[in-house]
């Protein structure tokens, strides 16, 4: 692998992707640095999940390139990529009666048996899944399944000595109650500060993005229309223009970050 020359973990340049004659992603460039959380936001149909699939290498762009740690993502050996990059999809269903612990253990498959149980125990505790450990995954609520899937991808990236890695999450809080939304994003924020981890997630909740993201990319009909800090992106003019919603903006009483509310 090429040496990492700076803090950039992921660099996407001029990504474009179409289905038939429909342009889904149109000339998008962005970067994600280690030690930060990047949020991708945008209205329904903006192309957020498709962009995430391009960034992770699950699909190939028709134009442009995505580099992970300085190397084109398609050039990474599959097993090495799996130990360095993990993806939590929006929906994950299972047909067979796996226990929660067995689902979490799937994340360790790129590592073999090395440190397997330590990794599983660590991430189950981090994600507040201790009480779910022996339950049938199929019988869990949507929010509980979401926490288990987060534990799985964290297990995939767990190393006894942390290494540079990238975590991609597609709406990781969409099914969670308030406590677990806060618990999850506090955990993810802490991990990016304590480890050389870069994190990129699709979020619909703009207030969570404002509180926890270091950078925000706003997507609209496949185009990147705004990028910057929460302060720079989450303003009245930008949000009204691209979301077409009657909204207002106030300030969080503790952080002074923008907080969005819908008018009655």
Swiss-Prot record:
The protein's matches in InterPro entries, at most eight in alphabetical order, are given as: AAA+_ATPase, ABC_transporter-like_ATP-bd, ABC_transporter-like_CS, P-loop_NTPase
What membrane topology does this protein have?
Peripheral membrane protein
Q: Which SUPFAM superfamilies match?
A: P-loop containing nucleoside triphosphate hydrolases
Q: Where does ATP bind?
A: 42-49
Q: Which CDD domains match?
A: ABC_Iron-Siderophores_B12_Hemin (cd03214)
Instruction: Report whether Nucleotide-binding shows up as a keyword of the record.
Output: yes
Entry function: Part of the ABC transporter complex HmuTUV involved in hemin import. Responsible for energy coupling to the transport system.
How is the subunit organization of this protein annotated in UniProt? The complex is composed of two ATP-binding proteins (HmuV), two transmembrane proteins (HmuU) and a solute-binding protein (HmuT).
Report the family membership. Belongs to the ABC transporter superfamily. Heme (hemin) importer (TC 3.A.1.14.5) family.
Q: What is the protein name stated in its UniProt record?
A: Hemin import ATP-binding protein HmuV
Q: What is the lineage of its organism?
A: Bacteria, Pseudomonadati, Pseudomonadota, Gammaproteobacteria, Enterobacterales
């Amino acid at each position: 692998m090429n040496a990492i020359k700076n803090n950039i973990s992921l660099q996407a340049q001029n990504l474009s992707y179409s289905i038939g004659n429909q342009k889904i992603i149109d000339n998008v460039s962005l970067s994600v640095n280690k030690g930060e959380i990047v949020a991708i936001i945008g209205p329904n149909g903006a192309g957020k999940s498709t962009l995430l699939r391009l960034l992770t290498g699950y699909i190939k762009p028709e134009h442009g390139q995505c580099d992970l740690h300085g190397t084109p993502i398609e050039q990474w050996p599959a097993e090495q990529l799996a130990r360095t990059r993990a993806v939590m999809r929006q929906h994950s269903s299972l047909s067979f009666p796996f226990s929660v612990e067995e689902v979490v253990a799937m994340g360790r498959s790129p590592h073999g048996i090395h440190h397997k149980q330590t990794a599983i125990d660590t991430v189950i505790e981090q994600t507040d899944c201790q009480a779910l450990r022996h339950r049938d995954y199929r019988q869990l609520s949507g929010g509980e399944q979401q926490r288990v899937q987060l534990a799985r991808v964290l297990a995939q990236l767990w190393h006894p000595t942390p290494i540079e890695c990238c975590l991609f999450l597609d709406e990781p809080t969409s099914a969670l109650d308030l406590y677990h939304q806060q618990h999850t994003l506090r955990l993810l924020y802490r991990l990016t500060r304590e480890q050389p981890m870069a994190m990129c997630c699709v979020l619909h909740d703009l207030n969570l993005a404002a509180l926890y993201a270091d950078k925000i990319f706003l997507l609209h009909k496949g185009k990147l229309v705004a990028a910057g800090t929460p302060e720079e992106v989450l303003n009245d003019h930008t949000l009204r223009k691209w979301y077409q919603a009657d909204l207002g903006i106030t300030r969080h009483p503790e952080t002074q970050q923008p907080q969005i509310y819908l008018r009655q």
